[in-house]
Amino acid sequence: MILLKEADGSYFAECTSTYSEEEKMLYDIINKYPYDFDLDRLQWKIPEACYKEIQSAIQSIPKPGSSLKLPLFPYQEDIVSFCLNKGRALIAAVCGLGKTPCLIAIYADAIKQKKITGSGLIVVKASLKVQWKKEVEKFTDLRAVILDTEKAKTSSISAKIRRTQKKIDSLLKEKSHEADVKIAELTAQIETLQEQATTLFRSQFENADLYIANYETLNDTAVRKELHRRKIQYMACDEIQYIKNDRAARSKSVCEFSDVKMRFGASATPIQKNPLDAYSIMKFLEPTLFPKKGQFEQRYIRYSGYGIIAGSKNEEELNNKLSNFMIVKTHEDADSCLPSVVPITRYCEMDPKQIRMTEQLLEEIKALKEEEQEILKKYTNPEQGKQNERVKIIDANIVARQTFAQELADSEMLLESSNSEMAHNYITGSKSAKLEMLIDLLEEILATGEKVCIFSKYKRMQDILTARIQEEAKHNPDFNTGIAYINGSLSAEQRYTESHTKFQDSNDYQILIMSDAGAEGISLGKAKYLIEYEPAESYSIQTQRRGRIERADSVHDTVFVYQLIAEKSYDEIALKVIAKKEKYDAAIIKGVS
Protein backbone atom coordinates (compact mmCIF):
# COMPACT_ATOMS: atom_id res chain seq x y z
CA MET A 1 0.00 0.00 0.00
CA ILE A 2 1.22 3.49 -0.91
CA LEU A 3 0.43 6.50 1.29
CA LEU A 4 0.24 10.01 -0.18
CA LYS A 5 0.08 13.40 1.52
CA GLU A 6 -1.05 16.23 -0.75
CA ALA A 7 -0.05 19.89 -0.50
CA ASP A 8 -3.58 20.85 0.57
CA GLY A 9 -3.27 18.61 3.64
CA SER A 10 -5.41 15.76 2.32
CA TYR A 11 -4.35 12.13 2.66
CA PHE A 12 -4.71 9.24 0.22
CA ALA A 13 -3.97 5.50 0.22
CA GLU A 14 -3.38 3.46 -2.93
CA CYS A 15 -3.50 -0.32 -3.15
CA THR A 16 -0.69 -2.32 -4.74
CA SER A 17 -0.94 -5.35 -7.00
CA THR A 18 -0.03 -7.83 -4.26
CA TYR A 19 -2.99 -8.59 -1.98
CA SER A 20 -1.12 -10.04 0.97
CA GLU A 21 -1.96 -10.70 4.61
CA GLU A 22 -0.17 -7.48 5.48
CA GLU A 23 -2.19 -5.53 2.92
CA LYS A 24 -5.41 -6.98 4.31
CA MET A 25 -4.38 -5.71 7.72
CA LEU A 26 -3.97 -2.22 6.25
CA TYR A 27 -7.39 -2.40 4.58
CA ASP A 28 -8.89 -3.30 7.96
CA ILE A 29 -7.39 -0.09 9.37
CA ILE A 30 -9.01 1.97 6.58
CA ASN A 31 -12.38 0.39 7.35
CA LYS A 32 -12.17 1.69 10.92
CA TYR A 33 -12.37 5.28 9.66
CA PRO A 34 -14.72 7.25 7.44
CA TYR A 35 -13.28 7.46 3.93
CA ASP A 36 -14.15 8.29 0.32
CA PHE A 37 -12.96 6.41 -2.74
CA ASP A 38 -11.73 8.75 -5.47
CA LEU A 39 -12.72 7.12 -8.78
CA ASP A 40 -10.51 9.44 -10.81
CA ARG A 41 -7.40 8.73 -8.76
CA LEU A 42 -8.41 5.15 -7.85
CA GLN A 43 -7.32 5.93 -4.30
CA TRP A 44 -8.89 6.15 -0.87
CA LYS A 45 -9.16 9.60 0.67
CA ILE A 46 -8.57 9.04 4.37
CA PRO A 47 -8.41 11.17 7.54
CA GLU A 48 -5.07 12.09 9.12
CA ALA A 49 -5.52 9.65 12.03
CA CYS A 50 -6.02 6.77 9.59
CA TYR A 51 -2.93 7.88 7.63
CA LYS A 52 -0.77 7.85 10.76
CA GLU A 53 -2.07 4.48 11.94
CA ILE A 54 -1.37 2.89 8.54
CA GLN A 55 2.07 4.52 8.47
CA SER A 56 2.86 3.04 11.88
CA ALA A 57 1.56 -0.38 10.83
CA ILE A 58 3.69 -0.38 7.66
CA GLN A 59 6.81 0.32 9.70
CA SER A 60 6.03 -2.67 11.92
CA ILE A 61 5.76 -5.09 8.97
CA PRO A 62 9.00 -7.11 8.75
CA LYS A 63 10.99 -6.61 5.57
CA PRO A 64 11.24 -9.76 3.41
CA GLY A 65 14.51 -11.51 4.14
CA SER A 66 14.97 -9.71 7.46
CA SER A 67 15.89 -13.07 9.03
CA LEU A 68 19.08 -13.27 6.95
CA LYS A 69 22.55 -12.03 7.87
CA LEU A 70 22.92 -10.31 4.49
CA PRO A 71 20.37 -8.04 2.78
CA LEU A 72 18.44 -9.14 -0.27
CA PHE A 73 18.15 -7.17 -3.48
CA PRO A 74 14.70 -5.59 -4.06
CA TYR A 75 13.77 -8.17 -6.71
CA GLN A 76 14.67 -10.94 -4.24
CA GLU A 77 12.47 -9.28 -1.63
CA ASP A 78 9.63 -9.44 -4.16
CA ILE A 79 10.20 -13.18 -4.54
CA VAL A 80 10.26 -13.81 -0.78
CA SER A 81 7.18 -11.67 -0.16
CA PHE A 82 5.23 -13.40 -2.94
CA CYS A 83 6.12 -16.86 -1.67
CA LEU A 84 5.38 -16.10 1.98
CA ASN A 85 1.96 -14.77 1.05
CA LYS A 86 1.12 -17.63 -1.31
CA GLY A 87 2.51 -20.48 0.78
CA ARG A 88 3.33 -22.46 -2.35
CA ALA A 89 4.83 -21.06 -5.53
CA LEU A 90 7.11 -21.54 -8.51
CA ILE A 91 10.08 -19.17 -8.73
CA ALA A 92 11.05 -18.77 -12.38
CA ALA A 93 14.25 -16.73 -12.25
CA VAL A 94 17.12 -16.78 -14.73
CA CYS A 95 20.63 -17.97 -13.82
CA GLY A 96 22.58 -15.81 -11.44
CA LEU A 97 19.70 -13.93 -9.81
CA GLY A 98 20.13 -15.66 -6.45
CA LYS A 99 17.29 -18.11 -6.05
CA THR A 100 19.21 -19.86 -3.26
CA PRO A 101 19.08 -17.01 -0.70
CA CYS A 102 15.41 -16.52 -1.57
CA LEU A 103 14.50 -20.10 -0.66
CA ILE A 104 16.56 -19.82 2.53
CA ALA A 105 14.89 -16.51 3.42
CA ILE A 106 11.41 -17.91 2.86
CA TYR A 107 12.05 -20.66 5.40
CA ALA A 108 13.77 -18.35 7.91
CA ASP A 109 11.05 -15.69 7.66
CA ALA A 110 8.27 -18.28 7.86
CA ILE A 111 9.78 -19.65 11.07
CA LYS A 112 10.22 -16.15 12.51
CA GLN A 113 6.64 -15.19 11.63
CA LYS A 114 5.37 -18.50 13.09
CA LYS A 115 3.81 -19.53 9.79
CA ILE A 116 5.51 -22.91 10.25
CA THR A 117 7.41 -24.83 12.90
CA GLY A 118 10.09 -27.51 12.81
CA SER A 119 12.64 -28.50 10.22
CA GLY A 120 12.41 -27.82 6.50
CA LEU A 121 13.64 -29.75 3.46
CA ILE A 122 15.44 -28.48 0.38
CA VAL A 123 15.86 -30.91 -2.54
CA VAL A 124 18.76 -30.17 -4.88
CA LYS A 125 20.99 -31.69 -7.55
CA ALA A 126 23.58 -34.07 -6.13
CA SER A 127 26.42 -31.81 -7.27
CA LEU A 128 25.00 -28.85 -5.33
CA LYS A 129 24.49 -30.36 -1.87
CA VAL A 130 27.68 -28.92 -0.42
CA GLN A 131 27.05 -25.58 -2.11
CA TRP A 132 23.61 -25.34 -0.52
CA LYS A 133 24.92 -26.15 2.95
CA LYS A 134 27.51 -23.40 2.62
CA GLU A 135 24.89 -20.92 1.45
CA VAL A 136 22.66 -21.66 4.45
CA GLU A 137 25.65 -21.06 6.74
CA LYS A 138 26.55 -17.88 4.85
CA PHE A 139 23.12 -16.28 5.10
CA THR A 140 21.85 -17.59 8.46
CA ASP A 141 22.74 -19.21 11.76
CA LEU A 142 20.49 -22.13 10.89
CA ARG A 143 21.94 -25.64 11.06
CA ALA A 144 21.82 -27.40 7.71
CA VAL A 145 22.37 -31.16 7.41
CA ILE A 146 22.99 -33.13 4.22
CA LEU A 147 20.92 -36.30 4.36
CA ASP A 148 22.25 -39.71 3.35
CA THR A 149 20.26 -42.74 2.27
CA GLU A 150 19.80 -45.49 4.82
CA LYS A 151 22.23 -47.69 2.87
CA ALA A 152 24.96 -45.04 2.74
CA LYS A 153 24.56 -43.97 6.35
CA THR A 154 24.62 -47.48 7.81
CA SER A 155 27.00 -49.21 5.38
CA SER A 156 29.60 -50.15 8.02
CA ILE A 157 26.98 -51.63 10.35
CA SER A 158 25.32 -53.45 7.46
CA ALA A 159 28.68 -55.01 6.61
CA LYS A 160 28.94 -56.32 10.18
CA ILE A 161 25.43 -57.74 9.94
CA ARG A 162 26.29 -59.55 6.71
CA ARG A 163 29.45 -61.03 8.23
CA THR A 164 27.52 -62.16 11.30
CA GLN A 165 24.81 -63.70 9.14
CA LYS A 166 27.45 -65.67 7.22
CA LYS A 167 28.64 -67.13 10.51
CA ILE A 168 25.07 -68.14 11.35
CA ASP A 169 24.62 -69.74 7.92
CA SER A 170 27.79 -71.74 8.50
CA LEU A 171 26.71 -72.85 11.99
CA LEU A 172 23.31 -73.96 10.72
CA LYS A 173 25.07 -76.79 8.92
CA GLU A 174 26.26 -78.13 12.25
CA LYS A 175 23.95 -80.22 14.38
CA SER A 176 25.12 -79.51 17.91
CA HIS A 177 24.05 -77.80 21.09
CA GLU A 178 27.14 -75.58 20.98
CA ALA A 179 26.19 -74.41 17.49
CA ASP A 180 22.64 -73.59 18.61
CA VAL A 181 23.94 -71.55 21.54
CA LYS A 182 26.32 -69.66 19.26
CA ILE A 183 23.55 -69.03 16.71
CA ALA A 184 21.39 -67.54 19.46
CA GLU A 185 24.23 -65.24 20.51
CA LEU A 186 24.91 -64.13 16.94
CA THR A 187 21.19 -63.56 16.29
CA ALA A 188 21.07 -61.31 19.34
CA GLN A 189 24.11 -59.45 17.98
CA ILE A 190 22.33 -58.87 14.68
CA GLU A 191 19.28 -57.48 16.49
CA THR A 192 21.54 -55.10 18.41
CA LEU A 193 23.31 -54.05 15.22
CA GLN A 194 19.98 -53.44 13.50
CA GLU A 195 18.92 -51.20 16.38
CA GLN A 196 22.22 -49.35 16.13
CA ALA A 197 21.71 -48.90 12.39
CA THR A 198 18.24 -47.44 12.93
CA THR A 199 19.56 -45.09 15.61
CA LEU A 200 22.47 -44.00 13.41
CA PHE A 201 20.24 -43.39 10.41
CA ARG A 202 17.75 -41.34 12.41
CA SER A 203 20.49 -39.37 14.17
CA GLN A 204 21.17 -37.31 11.03
CA PHE A 205 17.65 -35.89 11.34
CA GLU A 206 18.25 -34.59 14.86
CA ASN A 207 19.10 -30.99 15.75
CA ALA A 208 18.72 -29.68 12.19
CA ASP A 209 16.81 -26.69 10.89
CA LEU A 210 17.13 -27.46 7.20
CA TYR A 211 17.60 -30.88 5.65
CA ILE A 212 19.37 -30.92 2.28
CA ALA A 213 18.81 -33.95 0.06
CA ASN A 214 19.43 -34.62 -3.59
CA TYR A 215 16.63 -36.07 -5.68
CA GLU A 216 18.16 -39.56 -5.62
CA THR A 217 18.34 -39.53 -1.82
CA LEU A 218 14.65 -38.66 -1.67
CA ASN A 219 13.96 -41.83 -3.65
CA ASP A 220 15.08 -43.78 -0.58
CA THR A 221 12.01 -45.17 1.19
CA ALA A 222 13.57 -44.87 4.64
CA VAL A 223 14.41 -41.18 4.09
CA ARG A 224 10.87 -40.37 2.96
CA LYS A 225 9.37 -42.34 5.84
CA GLU A 226 11.47 -40.44 8.39
CA LEU A 227 10.57 -37.08 6.82
CA HIS A 228 6.88 -37.98 6.99
CA ARG A 229 7.32 -39.05 10.60
CA ARG A 230 8.73 -35.65 11.43
CA LYS A 231 5.86 -33.86 9.68
CA ILE A 232 7.96 -31.24 7.88
CA GLN A 233 6.06 -28.05 7.04
CA TYR A 234 8.46 -26.55 4.49
CA MET A 235 9.82 -28.12 1.30
CA ALA A 236 11.60 -26.46 -1.61
CA CYS A 237 12.89 -28.03 -4.81
CA ASP A 238 15.83 -26.29 -6.44
CA GLU A 239 16.00 -26.94 -10.21
CA ILE A 240 12.45 -28.21 -10.01
CA GLN A 241 12.51 -29.04 -13.72
CA TYR A 242 14.09 -32.30 -12.52
CA ILE A 243 10.54 -33.53 -11.80
CA LYS A 244 9.16 -32.55 -15.21
CA ASN A 245 8.33 -36.19 -15.99
CA ASP A 246 5.48 -37.12 -13.64
CA ARG A 247 6.15 -40.83 -14.22
CA ALA A 248 9.78 -40.69 -13.11
CA ALA A 249 10.72 -42.07 -9.70
CA ARG A 250 12.11 -38.73 -8.51
CA SER A 251 8.85 -36.97 -9.44
CA LYS A 252 6.77 -39.52 -7.56
CA SER A 253 9.03 -39.18 -4.53
CA VAL A 254 8.67 -35.39 -4.51
CA CYS A 255 4.91 -35.46 -5.09
CA GLU A 256 4.55 -37.75 -2.09
CA PHE A 257 5.02 -34.53 -0.10
CA SER A 258 2.33 -32.47 -1.85
CA ASP A 259 0.56 -32.12 1.50
CA VAL A 260 3.42 -30.19 3.12
CA LYS A 261 2.14 -26.81 4.33
CA MET A 262 4.62 -24.61 2.42
CA ARG A 263 5.95 -25.87 -0.93
CA PHE A 264 8.19 -24.10 -3.42
CA GLY A 265 10.12 -24.78 -6.59
CA ALA A 266 12.82 -22.77 -8.33
CA SER A 267 14.19 -22.97 -11.85
CA ALA A 268 15.66 -20.82 -14.58
CA THR A 269 13.81 -22.92 -17.17
CA PRO A 270 10.85 -24.69 -15.54
CA ILE A 271 9.36 -25.70 -18.90
CA GLN A 272 12.10 -27.28 -21.00
CA LYS A 273 10.32 -29.66 -23.34
CA ASN A 274 6.57 -29.04 -23.50
CA PRO A 275 3.65 -27.87 -21.30
CA LEU A 276 3.50 -31.29 -19.62
CA ASP A 277 6.53 -30.15 -17.64
CA ALA A 278 4.26 -27.61 -15.95
CA TYR A 279 1.70 -30.29 -15.15
CA SER A 280 4.25 -32.41 -13.32
CA ILE A 281 5.70 -29.45 -11.42
CA MET A 282 2.28 -28.20 -10.32
CA LYS A 283 1.34 -31.72 -9.28
CA PHE A 284 3.69 -31.08 -6.37
CA LEU A 285 3.21 -27.35 -5.84
CA GLU A 286 -0.57 -27.11 -6.31
CA PRO A 287 -2.14 -30.47 -7.28
CA THR A 288 -5.68 -29.02 -7.34
CA LEU A 289 -4.76 -26.64 -10.19
CA PHE A 290 -4.66 -29.45 -12.78
CA PRO A 291 -6.35 -32.41 -11.06
CA LYS A 292 -6.45 -34.70 -14.11
CA LYS A 293 -3.62 -35.22 -16.58
CA GLY A 294 -5.97 -36.18 -19.41
CA GLN A 295 -7.87 -32.92 -19.11
CA PHE A 296 -4.60 -30.97 -19.03
CA GLU A 297 -3.39 -32.68 -22.22
CA GLN A 298 -6.68 -32.09 -23.98
CA ARG A 299 -6.70 -28.41 -23.07
CA TYR A 300 -3.06 -27.40 -23.50
CA ILE A 301 -1.21 -29.98 -25.63
CA ARG A 302 -1.28 -30.02 -29.42
CA TYR A 303 -0.60 -33.41 -30.99
CA SER A 304 0.50 -34.12 -34.55
CA GLY A 305 -0.66 -37.73 -34.55
CA TYR A 306 0.62 -41.05 -33.18
CA GLY A 307 0.69 -39.45 -29.74
CA ILE A 308 3.56 -37.14 -30.76
CA ILE A 309 3.44 -33.72 -29.09
CA ALA A 310 3.67 -30.99 -31.72
CA GLY A 311 3.27 -27.98 -29.47
CA SER A 312 0.91 -26.18 -27.15
CA LYS A 313 -2.41 -24.38 -27.28
CA ASN A 314 -4.40 -22.03 -25.06
CA GLU A 315 -1.09 -20.64 -23.84
CA GLU A 316 -2.54 -17.42 -22.45
CA GLU A 317 -5.04 -19.33 -20.35
CA LEU A 318 -2.32 -21.65 -19.09
CA ASN A 319 -0.10 -18.70 -18.21
CA ASN A 320 -2.94 -17.02 -16.32
CA LYS A 321 -3.51 -20.15 -14.27
CA LEU A 322 0.17 -20.61 -13.52
CA SER A 323 0.63 -16.92 -12.71
CA ASN A 324 -1.44 -17.29 -9.57
CA PHE A 325 1.32 -19.51 -8.18
CA MET A 326 4.36 -18.23 -10.10
CA ILE A 327 6.71 -15.27 -9.83
CA VAL A 328 8.98 -14.54 -12.80
CA LYS A 329 12.24 -12.59 -12.59
CA THR A 330 14.55 -11.83 -15.52
CA HIS A 331 18.00 -10.25 -15.70
CA GLU A 332 16.27 -6.98 -16.49
CA ASP A 333 14.65 -7.08 -13.05
CA ALA A 334 18.10 -7.31 -11.47
CA ASP A 335 20.28 -5.15 -13.70
CA SER A 336 19.79 -2.02 -11.61
CA CYS A 337 20.65 -3.88 -8.41
CA LEU A 338 23.57 -6.15 -9.20
CA PRO A 339 27.19 -5.12 -9.72
CA SER A 340 28.57 -5.35 -13.24
CA VAL A 341 30.26 -8.66 -12.42
CA VAL A 342 28.62 -11.16 -10.09
CA PRO A 343 31.09 -13.77 -8.75
CA ILE A 344 29.52 -17.05 -7.62
CA THR A 345 31.36 -19.97 -6.04
CA ARG A 346 30.02 -23.49 -6.37
CA TYR A 347 31.32 -26.34 -4.23
CA CYS A 348 31.41 -30.10 -4.66
CA GLU A 349 32.72 -33.04 -2.65
CA MET A 350 35.49 -35.29 -3.90
CA ASP A 351 35.34 -39.03 -3.40
CA PRO A 352 36.79 -40.08 0.01
CA LYS A 353 39.60 -41.92 -1.80
CA GLN A 354 40.52 -38.72 -3.62
CA ILE A 355 40.50 -36.77 -0.36
CA ARG A 356 42.89 -39.28 1.20
CA MET A 357 45.12 -39.13 -1.88
CA THR A 358 45.17 -35.33 -1.70
CA GLU A 359 46.20 -35.54 1.95
CA GLN A 360 49.01 -37.91 0.96
CA LEU A 361 50.23 -35.50 -1.72
CA LEU A 362 50.18 -32.58 0.69
CA GLU A 363 52.14 -34.59 3.25
CA GLU A 364 54.72 -35.42 0.60
CA ILE A 365 54.96 -31.74 -0.36
CA LYS A 366 55.39 -30.80 3.29
CA ALA A 367 58.20 -33.34 3.74
CA LEU A 368 59.96 -32.09 0.60
CA LYS A 369 59.75 -28.48 1.76
CA GLU A 370 61.19 -29.42 5.14
CA GLU A 371 64.08 -31.22 3.43
CA GLU A 372 64.68 -28.18 1.24
CA GLN A 373 64.73 -25.85 4.22
CA GLU A 374 67.38 -27.96 5.93
CA ILE A 375 69.60 -27.71 2.85
CA LEU A 376 69.05 -23.96 2.44
CA LYS A 377 70.04 -23.36 6.06
CA LYS A 378 73.61 -24.21 5.04
CA TYR A 379 73.75 -21.26 2.63
CA THR A 380 74.14 -17.64 3.67
CA ASN A 381 72.93 -16.59 0.23
CA PRO A 382 69.47 -18.10 -0.56
CA GLU A 383 70.04 -17.67 -4.30
CA GLN A 384 73.13 -19.84 -4.13
CA GLY A 385 71.16 -22.43 -2.22
CA LYS A 386 68.58 -22.54 -5.00
CA GLN A 387 71.35 -23.63 -7.39
CA ASN A 388 71.99 -26.74 -5.32
CA GLU A 389 71.21 -29.78 -7.49
CA ARG A 390 69.23 -31.50 -4.76
CA VAL A 391 67.18 -28.33 -4.18
CA LYS A 392 66.39 -28.20 -7.91
CA ILE A 393 65.18 -31.80 -7.78
CA ILE A 394 63.11 -31.08 -4.68
CA ASP A 395 61.53 -28.01 -6.31
CA ALA A 396 60.63 -30.06 -9.37
CA ASN A 397 59.05 -32.74 -7.16
CA ILE A 398 57.06 -30.13 -5.23
CA VAL A 399 55.71 -28.56 -8.43
CA ALA A 400 54.89 -32.01 -9.82
CA ARG A 401 52.91 -32.97 -6.73
CA GLN A 402 51.10 -29.64 -6.67
CA THR A 403 50.11 -30.27 -10.28
CA PHE A 404 48.97 -33.81 -9.50
CA ALA A 405 46.88 -32.53 -6.56
CA GLN A 406 45.18 -29.95 -8.80
CA GLU A 407 44.59 -32.52 -11.54
CA LEU A 408 43.09 -34.86 -8.95
CA ALA A 409 40.57 -32.13 -8.09
CA ASP A 410 39.77 -31.48 -11.77
CA SER A 411 39.60 -34.98 -13.24
CA GLU A 412 41.70 -38.11 -12.86
CA MET A 413 41.69 -38.33 -16.65
CA LEU A 414 44.40 -35.66 -16.51
CA LEU A 415 46.56 -38.00 -14.44
CA GLU A 416 45.78 -40.91 -16.75
CA SER A 417 46.85 -38.95 -19.84
CA SER A 418 49.97 -37.54 -18.18
CA ASN A 419 53.40 -38.36 -19.64
CA SER A 420 54.70 -38.63 -16.09
CA GLU A 421 54.84 -42.16 -14.72
CA MET A 422 54.72 -40.64 -11.25
CA ALA A 423 51.28 -39.17 -11.99
CA HIS A 424 49.82 -42.64 -12.39
CA ASN A 425 50.64 -43.39 -8.74
CA TYR A 426 47.94 -40.96 -7.63
CA ILE A 427 45.03 -42.37 -9.61
CA THR A 428 42.20 -43.66 -7.37
CA GLY A 429 39.76 -44.71 -10.09
CA SER A 430 37.12 -42.24 -8.85
CA LYS A 431 34.89 -40.08 -11.04
CA SER A 432 35.17 -36.29 -11.09
CA ALA A 433 32.49 -34.59 -9.00
CA LYS A 434 33.63 -31.25 -10.40
CA LEU A 435 33.08 -32.39 -13.99
CA GLU A 436 29.51 -33.38 -13.15
CA MET A 437 28.96 -30.07 -11.36
CA LEU A 438 30.11 -28.30 -14.54
CA ILE A 439 27.62 -30.26 -16.64
CA ASP A 440 24.81 -29.32 -14.24
CA LEU A 441 25.78 -25.66 -14.50
CA LEU A 442 26.04 -25.79 -18.30
CA GLU A 443 22.58 -27.35 -18.42
CA GLU A 444 21.19 -24.25 -16.68
CA ILE A 445 23.08 -21.81 -18.90
CA LEU A 446 22.66 -23.44 -22.32
CA ALA A 447 18.90 -23.71 -21.82
CA THR A 448 18.77 -19.90 -21.73
CA GLY A 449 20.53 -19.57 -25.10
CA GLU A 450 23.34 -17.46 -23.62
CA LYS A 451 27.04 -17.87 -24.39
CA VAL A 452 29.52 -19.19 -21.83
CA CYS A 453 33.31 -19.19 -21.61
CA ILE A 454 35.10 -21.93 -19.64
CA PHE A 455 38.63 -21.43 -18.35
CA SER A 456 40.97 -24.26 -17.38
CA LYS A 457 44.72 -23.92 -17.02
CA TYR A 458 45.21 -27.34 -18.66
CA LYS A 459 45.04 -27.69 -22.43
CA ARG A 460 44.36 -31.43 -22.00
CA MET A 461 41.23 -30.50 -20.04
CA GLN A 462 39.71 -29.18 -23.26
CA ASP A 463 39.47 -32.69 -24.71
CA ILE A 464 38.02 -34.05 -21.46
CA LEU A 465 35.39 -31.31 -21.29
CA THR A 466 34.51 -31.72 -24.96
CA ALA A 467 34.03 -35.48 -24.63
CA ARG A 468 31.76 -35.05 -21.59
CA ILE A 469 29.69 -32.32 -23.29
CA GLN A 470 29.28 -34.46 -26.42
CA GLU A 471 28.22 -37.39 -24.26
CA GLU A 472 25.56 -35.22 -22.62
CA ALA A 473 24.38 -34.01 -26.04
CA LYS A 474 23.26 -37.56 -26.88
CA HIS A 475 20.24 -37.18 -24.58
CA ASN A 476 20.05 -33.40 -23.98
CA PRO A 477 19.56 -31.27 -27.13
CA ASP A 478 20.66 -28.10 -25.32
CA PHE A 479 24.22 -29.44 -25.47
CA ASN A 480 24.11 -29.73 -29.28
CA THR A 481 26.09 -26.55 -29.82
CA GLY A 482 29.39 -25.66 -31.41
CA ILE A 483 32.46 -25.40 -29.17
CA ALA A 484 35.29 -22.96 -29.87
CA TYR A 485 38.78 -23.38 -28.39
CA ILE A 486 41.72 -21.19 -27.48
CA ASN A 487 45.07 -22.45 -26.20
CA GLY A 488 48.75 -21.69 -26.54
CA SER A 489 49.18 -23.73 -29.73
CA LEU A 490 47.05 -21.35 -31.84
CA SER A 491 48.35 -18.51 -33.97
CA ALA A 492 46.88 -15.02 -33.64
CA GLU A 493 44.71 -15.62 -36.71
CA GLN A 494 43.44 -18.91 -35.36
CA ARG A 495 42.65 -17.29 -32.00
CA TYR A 496 40.60 -14.63 -33.76
CA THR A 497 38.71 -17.25 -35.75
CA GLU A 498 37.84 -19.16 -32.60
CA SER A 499 36.98 -16.19 -30.39
CA HIS A 500 35.27 -13.91 -32.91
CA THR A 501 34.25 -15.67 -36.10
CA LYS A 502 32.90 -18.67 -34.23
CA PHE A 503 32.08 -17.70 -30.66
CA GLN A 504 31.26 -13.99 -30.89
CA ASP A 505 29.64 -13.75 -34.31
CA SER A 506 27.98 -17.13 -34.86
CA ASN A 507 24.80 -18.34 -33.16
CA ASP A 508 26.00 -21.89 -33.74
CA TYR A 509 28.61 -21.60 -30.98
CA GLN A 510 27.53 -21.14 -27.36
CA ILE A 511 30.66 -22.51 -25.66
CA LEU A 512 34.26 -21.28 -25.70
CA ILE A 513 36.84 -23.36 -23.80
CA MET A 514 40.09 -21.54 -23.08
CA SER A 515 43.38 -22.18 -21.36
CA ASP A 516 45.03 -19.23 -19.65
CA ALA A 517 46.58 -18.44 -23.02
CA GLY A 518 43.27 -16.71 -23.68
CA ALA A 519 43.30 -14.69 -20.46
CA GLU A 520 44.65 -11.60 -22.19
CA GLY A 521 43.87 -9.64 -25.32
CA ILE A 522 40.49 -11.17 -26.14
CA SER A 523 37.17 -9.37 -25.82
CA LEU A 524 34.15 -11.58 -25.24
CA GLY A 525 31.36 -9.04 -25.11
CA LYS A 526 28.74 -11.57 -26.19
CA ALA A 527 29.40 -13.92 -23.25
CA LYS A 528 27.15 -13.52 -20.23
CA TYR A 529 28.74 -16.34 -18.23
CA LEU A 530 32.32 -17.28 -17.40
CA ILE A 531 33.27 -20.46 -15.55
CA GLU A 532 36.64 -20.95 -13.87
CA TYR A 533 37.00 -24.73 -13.79
CA GLU A 534 39.76 -24.36 -11.22
CA PRO A 535 41.28 -21.32 -9.46
CA ALA A 536 43.77 -19.31 -11.48
CA GLU A 537 47.49 -19.51 -10.76
CA SER A 538 47.43 -15.99 -9.34
CA TYR A 539 45.21 -13.04 -8.53
CA SER A 540 46.54 -11.32 -11.65
CA ILE A 541 45.49 -14.18 -13.93
CA GLN A 542 42.13 -14.39 -12.17
CA THR A 543 41.60 -10.68 -12.85
CA GLN A 544 42.59 -11.16 -16.50
CA ARG A 545 40.28 -14.14 -16.89
CA ARG A 546 37.30 -12.25 -15.57
CA GLY A 547 38.20 -9.22 -17.60
CA ARG A 548 37.32 -11.11 -20.79
CA ILE A 549 33.60 -10.52 -20.11
CA GLU A 550 33.79 -7.35 -18.00
CA ARG A 551 34.20 -5.04 -20.98
CA ALA A 552 32.91 -1.75 -22.31
CA ASP A 553 31.64 -3.47 -25.45
CA SER A 554 29.64 -6.07 -23.53
CA VAL A 555 26.07 -6.45 -24.72
CA HIS A 556 25.05 -7.31 -21.14
CA ASP A 557 24.60 -5.00 -18.17
CA THR A 558 25.39 -7.84 -15.78
CA VAL A 559 27.72 -10.78 -16.28
CA PHE A 560 28.29 -13.79 -14.05
CA VAL A 561 31.52 -15.54 -13.05
CA TYR A 562 31.29 -19.05 -11.59
CA GLN A 563 34.25 -20.55 -9.76
CA LEU A 564 34.15 -24.34 -9.26
CA ILE A 565 35.78 -25.59 -6.06
CA ALA A 566 36.23 -29.16 -4.81
CA GLU A 567 36.23 -29.22 -1.02
CA LYS A 568 39.30 -30.60 0.77
CA SER A 569 41.24 -30.41 -2.48
CA TYR A 570 44.15 -28.38 -3.81
CA ASP A 571 41.56 -25.84 -4.98
CA GLU A 572 41.34 -24.52 -1.42
CA ILE A 573 45.10 -23.94 -1.27
CA ALA A 574 45.00 -22.16 -4.64
CA LEU A 575 42.26 -19.86 -3.30
CA LYS A 576 44.45 -18.91 -0.34
CA VAL A 577 47.27 -17.99 -2.71
CA ILE A 578 44.92 -15.76 -4.72
CA ALA A 579 43.51 -14.15 -1.57
CA LYS A 580 47.01 -13.37 -0.35
CA LYS A 581 47.95 -11.72 -3.66
CA GLU A 582 44.64 -9.84 -3.70
CA LYS A 583 45.51 -8.31 -0.31
CA TYR A 584 48.79 -7.15 -1.79
CA ASP A 585 46.97 -5.53 -4.67
CA ALA A 586 44.49 -3.84 -2.34
CA ALA A 587 47.13 -2.51 0.05
CA ILE A 588 49.97 -1.60 -2.31
CA ILE A 589 48.22 -0.65 -5.54
CA LYS A 590 44.79 0.57 -4.40
CA GLY A 591 45.78 1.87 -0.99
CA VAL A 592 43.07 -0.05 0.83
CA SER A 593 44.08 -1.44 4.21
State where each predicted segment sits:
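SF2 helicase motor core recognition
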Residues: 219-222, 273-275, 462-464, 496, ...
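Inter-lobe coupling linker of SF2 helicases/translocases
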Residues: 212-218, 224-231, 249-260, 291-418, ...
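Conserved pre-motif I regulatory segment
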Residues: 60-92
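Conserved Helicase C-terminal RecA-like lobe
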Residues: 94, 102, 107-112, 121, ...
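Accessory DNA-engaging acidic/polar modules
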Residues: 1-69
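Conserved P-loop NTPase motor "coupling/switch" region that bridges the ATPase
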Residues: 119, 138, 150-174, 180, ...
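Conserved Walker A/P-loop ATP-binding site and its immediately adjacent core
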Residues: 102, 117-139, 273-277, 457-460
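A conserved SF2-helicase RecA2
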Residues: 537-543, 550-593
